[in-house]
């Protein structure tokens, strides 16, 4: 099961009949709504479709509002587009003018007071570079450094300059309030520079009693420099490489990406890697080799999620792009070296609180015993977030009480969130959660699972219990020899002669006791169960020598177990359980 989550941006391509359904059915985890484009009516229409379809398919698709942020854009050009030539003069002004190939207005009126001669200004994601020659009260006179076509409303970046513009605009405030009203799960805060920027958004959410999670988009040098303070107040970060690649020397981006992902992992926070991951698939049905490697390397770096932007919003092949990204993620995670490359303590070498320590122990236990799943149930979903930070190889099945928490958890690496009714006791919680995981096809009879929760049940922030549990009902109990587990079909034999007639290699041999004439069958058995007790018995000694799963002292085993039954053997616990065929 893929653990890396995938974010898909909504747009005209996802509006086409059947596309949204295909995205959900093929692994989309988060729907991103880019508020730099479109109006409220357009966003609400798409939002309602996502919610309705995710309810129909019973999928916890999280909805993420991506703010416009404190960006600077060009004004209107008279002809909509102009050509700039290397060496020519071009003026940016805070005055309201009609744009030509000599002058254009900018949306940020204080820009002339923030820049100095000798600096650089980048237009349209860095496609055109301007050198600042002179700065006046309203005008910035520049020299064009390379030929290019410039269009109305294109972006303006000023590398290495602290802009005095306020973080929260009236537009962003209105957009966030719209998100609160609609019920969005996540907000990605564009151009986050420091902790205060995130707190400004948090203040608005708190005023409206909203539990929306905040993802800080790191897009400039200030955000990189202040990453640790941002992570203390944000729920996660997005490594937004688009504007970052304009603001910062492009050669530094790979190292910065690794650094940001590492800091997010250390803080135990969400990390999404974004921008141009499969950019060629906007027009082509297959990714380039470089793009495949880019996605894989982000996953090797430890990112919890990867994002598609124009590929799904406006591309010709949105479903193919999603499938390609999912395949790359699954293949990368299946690499034998993957676990060692992404292993991370998630603690940043600091002392853990009780809940985090229990979560860490649950992950370690699951790895040590080869558990099929870590199952957790919590009201707030915090336990699942704690488990995700430790990057276990085992899937995390998280039970929560409400749909909002379920959707918010769907952006966390390795977490499969499900709804469950309130449990009144620990025993009820374990039985309900294991039964639901089994009915969902996530575990099966005979699987070992690690269950972690809080005792007493129902109190948030009290994760303090771990239980190793085997799925299914116990048929027999005895003494396990060694630490192996086994699964297979039963063959009940009273003696070697009967075994010679009906035993097949790979079956579990069930006998009153063993003797030397049974050695050929014991060698080919998946496991051995005997009624005879004793760790020094023939079956125990031979089983250890052959490195087989053996349970001795299983009273009435030859009468309780029947030929053809499918069972599991847990030698650590000395338990035999029935399994569905």
Stretches found by the model and what they are:
Residues 3, 8-12, 42, 161, ...:
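Conserved alpha/beta-domain cores
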Residues 5-7, 30-32, 60-64, 89, ...:
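Structural preference for beta-strand elements that scaffold enzyme active sites
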Residues 9, 34, 66, 118, ...:
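Conserved, mostly hydrophobic/aromatic
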Residues 10-12, 29-40, 186-191, 237-248, ...:
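Glycine-rich phosphate-binding active-site loops on the catalytic face of alpha/beta enzymes
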Residues 38-42, 46, 394-395, 399-429, ...:
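Feature captures the catalytic cores and cofactor-binding loops of soluble hydro-lyases/lyases
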Residues 44-51, 202, 312-335, 467-468:
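C-terminal helical cap(s) of enzyme catalytic domains, especially alpha/beta-barrels
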Residues 70-169, 436, 442-497, 502, ...:
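Acidic, glycine-rich flexible loop/linker segments
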Residues 244-246, 277-291, 305-316, 342-347, ...:
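Short beta-alpha connecting loops at secondary-structure transitions
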């Amino acid at each position: 099961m893929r653990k890396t989550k995938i974010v898909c941006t909504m747009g005209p391509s996802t509006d086409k009949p059947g596309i949204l359904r295909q995205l959900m059915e093929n692994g989309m985890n988060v729907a991103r709504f880019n508020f730099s484009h479109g109006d409220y009516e357009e966003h609400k229409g798409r939002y309602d479709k996502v919610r309705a379809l995710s309810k129909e398919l019973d999928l916890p698709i999280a909805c993420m509002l991506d703010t416009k942020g404190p960006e600077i854009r060009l004004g209107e050009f008279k002809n909509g587009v102009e050509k700039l030539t290397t060496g020519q003069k071009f003026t940016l002004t805070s005055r309201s003018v009609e744009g030509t190939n000599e002058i254009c207005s900018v949306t940020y009126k204080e820009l002339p007071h923030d820049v100095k001669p000798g600096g650089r200004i980048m237009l349209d994601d860095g496609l055109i570079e301007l050198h600042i020659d002179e700065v006046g009260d309203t005008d910035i006179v520049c020299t064009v450094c390379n030929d290019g076509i410039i269009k109305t409303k294109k972006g303006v970046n000023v590398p290495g300059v602290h802009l005095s513009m306020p973080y929260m605009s009236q537009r962003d405030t209105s957009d966030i309030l719209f998100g609160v009203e609609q019920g969005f799960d996540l907000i990605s805060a564009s151009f986050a520079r420091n902790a205060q920027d995130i707190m400004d958004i948090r203040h608005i959410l708190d005023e409206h009693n909203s539990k929306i999670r905040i993802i800080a988009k790191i897009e400039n040098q200030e955000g990189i420099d202040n990453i640790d303070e941002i992570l203390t107040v944000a729920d996660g970060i997005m490594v937004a490489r688009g504007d970052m690649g304009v603001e910062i020397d492009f050669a530094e981006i790979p190292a910065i990406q690794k650094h940001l992902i590492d800091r997010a992992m250390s803080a135990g926070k969400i990390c999404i890697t974004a921008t141009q991951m499969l950019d060629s698939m906007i027009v082509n049905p297959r990714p380039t080799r470089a793009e495949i490697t880019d996605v894989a390397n982000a996953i090797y770096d430890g990112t919890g999620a990867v994002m598609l932007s124009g590929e799904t919003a406006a591309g010709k092949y949105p479903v193919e792009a999603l499938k390609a990204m999912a395949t790359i993620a699954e293949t990368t995670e299946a690499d034998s070296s993957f676990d060692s490359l992404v292993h991370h303590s998630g603690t940043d070498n600091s002392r853990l609180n009780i809940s985090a320590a229990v979560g860490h122990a649950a992950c370690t236990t699951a790895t040590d015993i080869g558990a099929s799943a870590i199952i957790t149930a919590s009201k707030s979903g915090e336990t699942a977030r704690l488990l995700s930070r430790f990057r276990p190889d085992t899937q995390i099945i998280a039970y929560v009480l409400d749909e909002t928490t379920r959707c918010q958890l769907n952006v966390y690496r390795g977490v499969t969130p499900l709804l469950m009714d309130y449990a009144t006791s620990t025993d009820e919680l374990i039985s309900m959660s294991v039964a639901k995981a089994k009915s969902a096809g996530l575990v099966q009879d005979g699987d070992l699972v690690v269950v972690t929760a809080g005792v007493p049940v129902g109190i948030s922030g009290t994760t303090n219990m771990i239980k190793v549990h085997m799925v299914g009902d116990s048929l027999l109990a005895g003494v396990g020899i060694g630490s192996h587990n086994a699964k297979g079909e039963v063959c009940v034999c009273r003696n070697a002669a009967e075994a010679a007639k009906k035993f097949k290699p790979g079956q579990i041999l069930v006998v009153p006791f063993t003797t030397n004439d049974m050695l050929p069958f014991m060698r080919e058995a998946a496991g051995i169960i005997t009624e005879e007790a004793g760790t020094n018995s023939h079956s125990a000694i031979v089983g250890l020598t052959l490195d087989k799963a053996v349970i001795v002292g299983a009273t009435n085993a030859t009468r309780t177990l029947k030929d053809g039954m499918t069972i599991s053997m847990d030698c650590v616990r000395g338990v035999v359980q029935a399994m569905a065929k």
